[in-house]
């Protein structure tokens, strides 16, 4: 299930189902709320503001994301799945890119639009591989948790790097590790490994492989069994891993206020 609550009290919510459930959308919704009582309690007093609907497929992808005098934002161009909530961050990254394009003139250059188009294609593939791996692993929580670590390492490394080492052109760095020599190929490789992780030994090796694969960008100490999946904000871990960010210990410590928006 996905659930997005807005400030004015309206919530966008829905279920993603592997197989079609018989009945009208209203009947399916009520059935799922009964099946999951905790969710049912949360939505017990909710009323729909529009008719409930069923869509056989939510994924889409167009042939191009940009052309002469036009460009699409990511979700107009392609959508994969709500899992990992990539939408807002990806859209903001694209808006930043387009804003940079307009800094050089009234209309973005053909070269900039081609670059924008190529990045959105590559990033759609990246999201697709990451989500496909997560669905493949979903029946085994330990495998799913390991797959999720790939996502969390990607976003935490990028967020920390952009705050501690800001760059005017950071928007052109690929979303979710696209173009990163350390992480760029990890989602596709993880999907391939998950498809062949049939035995317990294979599954243990996959978890170990993820830990090794994300290590060069793991600034937050993720994939640590001792935490039992609970990761508080731990600046000491970040400071110890200053080299991962290409910073000295002293320079990282002095830059820490930037993590909360300080100067």
What are the roles of these predicted feature ranges?
Residues 1-20, 65, 74:
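Active-site substrate-recognition segment that forms the wall
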């Amino acid at each position: 299930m996905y659930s997005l609550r807005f400030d004015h009290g309206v919530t966008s919510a829905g279920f993603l189902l592997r197989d079609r459930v018989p009945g009208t959308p209203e009947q399916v919704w009520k059935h799922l709320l009964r099946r999951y009582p905790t969710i049912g309690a949360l939505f017990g007093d909710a009323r729909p503001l529009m008719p409930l609907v069923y869509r056989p497929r939510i994924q889409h992808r167009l042939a191009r994301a940009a052309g002469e005098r036009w460009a699409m934002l990511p979700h107009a161009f392609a959508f994969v799945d709500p899992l990992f909530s990539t939408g807002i961050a990806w859209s903001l990254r694209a808006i930043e890119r387009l804003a940079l394009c307009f800094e050089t003139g009234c209309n973005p250059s053909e070269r900039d639009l081609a670059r924008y188009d190529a990045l959105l294609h590559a990033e759609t593939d990246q999201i697709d591989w990451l989500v496909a791996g997560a669905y493949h692993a979903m029946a085994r929580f330990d495998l799913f948790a390991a797959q999720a670590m790939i996502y969390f390492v990607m976003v935490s490394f990028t967020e920390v790097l952009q705050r501690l080492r800001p760059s005017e052109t950071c928007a052109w760095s690929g979303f979710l590790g696209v173009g990163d020599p350390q992480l760029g190929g990890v989602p596709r490789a993880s999907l391939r490994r998950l498809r062949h992780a049939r035995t317990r030994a294979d599954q243990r090796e996959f978890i170990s492989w993820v830990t090794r694969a994300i290590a060069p960008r793991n600034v937050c100490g993720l994939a640590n069994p001792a935490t039992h999946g609970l990761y508080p904000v731990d600046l000491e871990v970040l400071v110890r891993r200053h080299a991962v960010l290409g910073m000295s210990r002293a320079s990282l410590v002095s830059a820490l206020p930037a993590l909360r928006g300080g100067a």
